[in-house]
Every structure is written in structure tokens, then in C-alpha cells.
Amino acid sequence: IAQTPPPYQPGMGDLMVTIVQPRHLKLGLAGQARNWDYADYAQHELEEALETVEKHIPKWRNLDIGQLMAATVKQPLEEVEKAVKAKNAVAFDAAYRQVTEACNACHRSANLPAIVIKVPDASAFPNQEFRVTRP
């Protein structure tokens, strides 16, 4: 009798490239387009993605992921949320750069300085419009 394989357990890299990095990218693109409604959605989705990582991988390479995220990305994400709610482009750009740098600080803390995240300059989603449009 064939045994059912164990359920798939994504690793840290899997979660980062499949749920966190795309959310970071979409938030950046929405903010650059000043699409505040979508940026609000994307910001919350990025927070949820980070919470998913923390839930599924609370410890990684002797690092407490929750503590590391709280120390690096929590405050910048709060600043992004404030900027989006205020529809403040200058504040958004600054806060988003802080989130991006927080991602890189987290990578350095995990001894992975080669993983460098940047403010997007292109979309990986050619089938999605980030500018404000109404049907």
C-alpha cells in the first residue's frame, strides 16, 4: 500500500520568494503609482506574509524570527501604513525605503548579506495594472 507523503513544509527561502518578496514588490509598485487603495491592501498583505513566515518558521538558524522581524520591519511597516492612509507620497517613499533596508538588515542578521532587496524599478507582474484605474 502506498503511503501518503507528508504535507509539504516550505522552507524559509520558499516562503520569502513566494509570499514575502512578491508582496514587497507589489507594495512598492502600488506606492510608486500612488494607488493608495491598492497600497493599503498590499501593505496588509505584506504584514500577513511576514506573520505566516513567523508562524511556520519561528526559529531559523538559531534566530528568533518574531524578535528579528519586530526589531527590523515592524516600525517601518507602521510608517508605510501611516503614509498610505495620509496619501503622502514623500512619506511613503521614505518609509518604503526603510522597509526595504529593514529587509536587508534582517538578511545581514541571518548571515545572508548576499540577499539584497531593492526598491522596484520594474514589475514582475505584466498582467497587473498598478496605476489607479476604475472599470
Q: Which role does the model predict for each range below?
A:
Residues 5-135:
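Sequence context surrounding c-type heme c attachment/ligation sites in exported
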